[in-house]
């Protein structure tokens, strides 16, 4: 057949390529997800009369029902078959499910015990912990500015530990557990929402068993006559899944560098919630420590 028509190169002066327009829906989904994560403390605070382990167990049970239902309606059971066909992935998701349940436990305990400010610090330092894991585990290389950023953040944490009387263990526990969780999920190479569904299914039996014991002992919070608490416990599962579904949608459609900036929406809103809405202290000492970490993030970013 005839040769395909090829347009001759145009001799017009070169114009620098414009960056592609940002996907509005993707951006909106990502921002909405981070805002939801940011106001989580206010939600869990409403359940502070319920023991933390019961809150986590309900969160797992209702999250499993919501996410599995969402996936089955959307695409059937293929996601589960795909994961089960790779045993290594199953073991990795077992490890990640234990880490995320620990992370949720520390976070809910912090919120219901007046430590939201400390919890927010955990998510400010999380990106820098990710950097260190990248260096130590994935053998990524840092430039001088990035090393300076990590050093300043470490000094900020040391300042908080020495002058605040005790190490910011809630912040460190949240940052480390979430960073290692992120690493395992990266290596497992499973999409965010199917991964959360499988993690929830792994944790489902222990969660149901714990709730069963609580009900049998007469200390179960669910169904004890307070319909508001019951509704909050049920919707906590959907609220766990919704931002992750939104984030999974958004992160695929916007530049990853933009995700890196947007991730600070959540801890900023958590800090504001803790100080202005829940009345927690934010001392000058803490301001200096947080300030060092914000400087580090600005240098790294």
Describe these PLM feature segments.
Residues 49-54, 105-122, 245-262, 281:
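Structural motif at transmembrane-helix junctions in multi-pass transporters
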Residues 67, 145-161, 172-176, 285-301:
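Hydrophobic transmembrane alpha-helices of multi-pass small-molecule transport proteins
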Residues 36-63, 117-118, 180-205, 220:
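Juxtamembrane helix-loop-helix junctions in multi-pass membrane proteins
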Residues 3-32, 65-93, 144, 196, ...:
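Membrane-interface interhelical linkers
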């Amino acid at each position: 057949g005839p040769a395909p028509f090829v347009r001759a190169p145009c001799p017009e002066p070169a114009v620098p390529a414009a960056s592609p327009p940002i996907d509005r829906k993707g951006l909106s989904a990502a921002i909405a997800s981070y805002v939801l994560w940011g106001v989580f403390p206010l939600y869990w605070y409403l359940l502070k009369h319920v023991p933390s382990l019961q809150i986590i167990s309900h969160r797992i049970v209702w999250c499993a029902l919501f996410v599995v239902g969402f996936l089955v309606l959307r695409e059937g059971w293929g996601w589960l078959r795909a994961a089960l066909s790779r045993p290594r992935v199953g073991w990795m998701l077992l490890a990640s499910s234990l880490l995320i349940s620990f992370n949720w436990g520390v976070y809910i305990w912090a919120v219901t015990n007046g430590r939201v400010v400390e919890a927010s610090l955990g998510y400010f330092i999380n990106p820098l912990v990710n950097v260190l894991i990248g260096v130590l585990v994935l053998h990524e290389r840092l430039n001088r500015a990035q090393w300076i950023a990590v050093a300043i953040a470490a000094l900020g944490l040391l300042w908080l530990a020495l002058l605040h009387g005790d190490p910011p263990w809630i912040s460190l526990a949240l940052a480390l557990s979430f960073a290692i969780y992120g690493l395992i999920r990266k290596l497992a190479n499973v999409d965010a929402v199917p991964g959360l569904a499988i993690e929830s299914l792994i944790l489902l039996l222990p969660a149901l068993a714990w709730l069963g014991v609580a009900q049998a002992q007469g200390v179960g919070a669910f169904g004890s006559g307070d319909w508001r608490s019951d509704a909050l416990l049920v919707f906590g599962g959907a609220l766990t899944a919704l931002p992750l579904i939104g984030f999974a949608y958004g992160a695929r459609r916007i530049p990853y560098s933009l995700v890196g900036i947007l991730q600070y929406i959540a801890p900023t809103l958590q800090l504001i919630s803790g100080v202005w809405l829940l009345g927690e202290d934010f001392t000058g000492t803490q301001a200096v420590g947080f300030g060092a970490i914000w400087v580090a993030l600005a240098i790294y970013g």
